[in-house]
Regions:
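Generic multipass alpha-helical transmembrane bundles of integral membrane proteins
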Residues: 250-266
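Multi-pass membrane glycosyltransferase architecture that uses lipid-linked
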Residues: 1-248, 270-423
């Protein structure tokens, strides 16, 4: 594809996201970013309860069950703090400017990811496949809503995953993987296949150590320099491992039935225990993937990465919409380079994720919260007559997403001969 056309597509994708950047946002997550950037610059504890930011906050959906706290390593607090510092330096007292600045790392990360997908594919298969990939990512309603509207930053972490998979040196691969974990902890599920491609190779052992030690070292350095207290960090971050609730998965059925009171009083304890099943499941299937696929090849590596992503999505007690980005990014490369027959599966998965996102967020009304303070009342008035029907759609979409994940996993484990290790 000509360079001018690539640039034009990237600029268009950027402009579409920027059009939503300053006046939309999720009333829980994006409001947290607003409070977080303010707290970092005013001596607050980013891992404690974040109070509203004076003159900047726009929502307060928080409760005893959903407190205004974060569960990320220091990368994101630092970045939101930098955006607030930039806002303060500009000196224009306009909260929408702050919202615009907070969205910039997210949007730039998402557009950069589109280019990285194109670059990876085109370097291995010149032709139309790279063009399809960049079109898919830049203009998918799902990616646009998550970055430009919602304000979720997972695309930044996925950029590091793609860079890690692209690295020739195992140590460099470990460095990129470590930065991905530092950006958001989800990429830790990919560290083993990204770095441990040959257990007999000493560089692979070094790479996995680097990938795990780097985010810990960077986090420790930030806490020392910023003098942030560490009393709440471990419990806050660890609490997300088995966190449950409404989920873009078949777990929605369990949560729905429990909400109706049809399960015994011990069900929440069982649900909490089952919420941790994804960890041993991931360990087992990571071992299976490394044994089954030739992870020293590009194709085998991405098959293994897809297995890790799918196991995470299938067994995690709470799957939020942004988690699907990890699967979709890997699947785009898989479909474009090696398995075009899976394009229908990728398309269906994306459509189901979009449906779930729309239904789960009250038909997108809540994203207007920065400009419409009465959005909660409007949501209630519009949704109340159809609440049962919406809940059913919610459960169906979540279950359908898991069914598609299982189908993709079975397809993967069938494997093409070129991606499998010799017996």
């Amino acid at each position: 594809m000509p360079v001018r056309r690539i640039v034009a597509l990237l600029v268009l994708g950027l402009m579409i996201r920027e059009a939503f950047s300053f006046w939309t946002g999720h009333p829980f997550d994006f409001e947290l970013w607003v409070r977080l950037g303010y707290a970092v610059n005013h001596g607050g504890d980013p891992y404690g309860i974040l109070p509203p930011a004076p003159g900047l906050s726009f929502a307060n959906l928080f409760s005893s069950d959903s407190t205004p706290t974060i569960a990320y390593l220091p990368f994101w607090p630092l970045l939101t703090g930098l955006m607030y510092a930039t806002y303060s330096m500009i000196g224009l007292n306009d909260r929408f400017l702050y919202y615009f600045l907070l969205k910039q790392p997210v949007i730039i990360g998402d557009v950069t990811l589109a280019y990285l997908l194109y670059s990876y594919i085109s370097s291995r298969k010149p032709g139309a496949s790279g063009a399809w990939a960049i079109f898919f990512w830049l203009f998918s309603p799902f990616t646009i809503m998550l970055s430009g509207v919602w304000g979720m930053f997972d695309s930044i972490a996925i950029c590091f995953i793609i860079l890690s998979a692209s690295a020739v040196s195992r140590v460099k691969s470990g460095l990129w993987a470590g930065l991905g974990v530092f950006a958001k902890s989800v990429p830790i599920i990919f560290v083993t296949p990204l770095t441990l491609r040959n257990i007999r190779n000493g560089k692979s052992i070094v790479a996995i150590v680097v990938a795990l030690a780097l985010p810990l070292s960077l986090s420790a350095a930030v806490f020392l320099v910023m003098r942030w207290p560490v009393t709440l960090v471990n419990s806050t971050i660890a609490s997300t491992a088995g966190k449950g609730g409404w989920s873009m998965s078949i777990w929605d059925v369990f949560f729905y039935v429990n909400s109706l009171g049809w399960l015994p009083s011990s069900a929440p304890l069982l649900y909490g225990a089952l919420g941790l099943v994804w960890i041993p499941a991931l360990l087992v299937f990571t071992w299976v993937a490394i044994r089954r696929f030739r992870t020293d090849t590009d194709e085998g590596l991405f098959q293994a990465l897809l297995v890790c992503a799918l196991i995470f999505l299938i067994f995690k007690a709470r799957v939020t919409e942004q988690y699907a980005l990890y699967l979709l990014a890997l699947a785009v490369i898989d479909v474009a380079l090696w398995n075009p027959q899976r394009k229908t599966l990728l398309t269906l998965t994306t459509i189901v994720a979009i449906i779930y996102l729309v239904v789960n967020n009250y038909f997108l009304i809540r994203f207007l919260s920065p400009i419409y303070p009465g959005y909660v009342n409007f949501e209630n008035a519009m949704i109340a007559p159809f609440s049962n029907l919406i809940t059913i759609f919610h459960v169906i979409a979540g279950t359908a997403f898991t069914v598609l994940n299982v189908k993709y996993l079975l397809n993967l484990l069938g494997g093409r001969r070129s991606s499998l290790r010799p017996v």
